[in-house]
């Protein structure tokens, strides 16, 4: 027997594993929540359809939950790995296929993650270049006394 999302939200609204209260602000640590708002609309664990944008290494991972196979977790989630330089509109269209109301939030998040990954790539290259120039002198080893 399945319950409506309204009933489930009433039960978990005040107390949940994903609810984090910080200075009077309610945030969410739900893995399917794109912007950490503690609202019914953004609660991915409640909704049958959800989408989230994350990073996987130096690429962007879009995971969607389509709600067709609710009792089969393996086939319920679809994952698409995209390059960091992918346009935000591609991510937006992938999310809009499942949840059109979350498309703009997902594209914003993808844009921010892509810029972060690009910055990290530049920092790594600069560190590698600096470290290749450094040569370490071997210390003179004093002979052992007998």
Curated annotation (Swiss-Prot):
The keyword Phosphoprotein does not apply. One of its GO terms (molecular function) is structural constituent of ribosome. Residues 123-146 are annotated as: Disordered. InterPro entries: Ribosomal_eL28, Ribosomal_eL28/Mak16. Keywords: Ribonucleoprotein, Ribosomal protein. GO terms for biological process: translation. The keyword Nucleotide-binding does not apply. One of its GO terms (cellular component) is ribonucleoprotein complex. It comes from the Eukaryota. Gene3D superfamilies: 3.30.390.110. Pfam families: Ribosomal_L28e. Belongs to the eukaryotic ribosomal protein eL28 family. This is Large ribosomal subunit protein eL28. It comes from Trypanosoma cruzi. The lineage of its organism: Eukaryota, Discoba, Euglenozoa, Kinetoplastea, Metakinetoplastina.
């Amino acid at each position: 027997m399945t319950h409506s999302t309204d009933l489930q939200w009433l039960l978990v609204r005040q107390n949940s594993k994903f609810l984090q209260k910080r200075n009077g602000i309610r945030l969410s640590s739900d893995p399917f929540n794109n912007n950490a708002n503690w609202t019914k609309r953004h609660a991915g664990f409640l909704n049958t359809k959800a989408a989230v944008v994350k990073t996987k290494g130096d690429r962007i991972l879009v995971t969607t939950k389509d709600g067709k196979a609710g009792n089969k977790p393996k086939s319920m989630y679809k994952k698409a790995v995209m390059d960091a330089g992918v346009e935000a509109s591609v991510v937006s269209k992938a999310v809009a296929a499942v949840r059109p109301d979350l498309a703009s939030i997902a594209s914003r998040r993808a844009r921010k993650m892509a810029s972060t990954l690009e910055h990290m790539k530049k920092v790594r290259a600069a560190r590698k270049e600096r470290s290749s120039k450094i040569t370490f002198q071997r210390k003179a080893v004093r002979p052992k006394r007998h």
